[in-house]
A protein has these predicted regions:
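The catalytic Nudix box helix
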Residues: 46, 58-92
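Active-site segment of metal-dependent pyrophosphate-handling enzymes
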Residues: 79-119
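A glycine-rich, hydrophobic loop/mini-helix early in the fold
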Residues: 32-63
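Nudix hydrolase/Nudix homology domain
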Residues: 54-57, 100-104, 108, 118-172
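Acidic, metal-coordinating catalytic segment for phosphate/diphosphate chemistry
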Residues: 1-34, 40
């Protein structure tokens, strides 16, 4: 069974782990990673989560396994969930934060890359129903209709702010 590392409030590894699905003990935190993949047309790759995972649209993310850092964790999640290999040197961490309520550290990544033939990607059926490219306005509309995973939309807004401030790319 998959294990996750526990950290203190300063993100120091405590030497303790929990099993996937276990509650995070008070005073401890786990790491959550996610990534927004943007193509050269300015669209973002989203995945429709499986019915058992709420069936909403979201980006790819999850929890690093015990022993993985956040970069290794996001590389693993993307490979497992949608079958894509990412170049770690191209990853940009655009946000890092801590949620007391959820007892997590967030590490959000961004990468600009084109992925051809997304209909041929090897999806993890337990987690992902399908994938698609979406414009910024389409993502905003999904959110307005309640079809976008709330936590991931908050991270999308943080990405939009970061892209605008950093002039990393043409976001329109």
């Amino acid at each position: 069974m998959e294990r996750r590392d526990l950290y203190d409030k300063n993100r120091n590894f405590t030497g303790k782990t929990i099993y996937k699905g276990e509650s995070v003990p008070e005073g401890s935190y786990i790491v959550v990673v996610l990534i927004y993949i943007q193509n050269s047309k300015g669209e973002f790759l989203l995945q429709k989560r499986s019915a058992r995972k709420n069936g909403l649209w979201a980006t790819t993310g999850g929890h690093p396994k015990s022993g993985e850092d956040s970069i290794q964790g996001i590389l693993t999640e993307v490979k497992e969930e949608i079958g894509v290999d990412l170049n770690p040197e191209k990853l940009i961490k655009y946000y890092a934060g801590r949620s007391e309520k959820e007892r997590v550290f967030w590490d959000d990544y961004y990468i600009k890359m084109d992925i051809d033939n997304i209909e041929e990607l090897k999806l993890q059926k337990e987690e992902v129903e399908k994938v698609g490219w979406f414009s910024i306005n389409e993502i905003k509309n999904l959110n307005k209709k309640g079809k976008f995973f709330k936590n991931h939309y908050e991270e999308f807004e943080a990405l939009m702010d970061w892209l605008e401030k950093s002039n990393q790319c043409n976001i329109i």
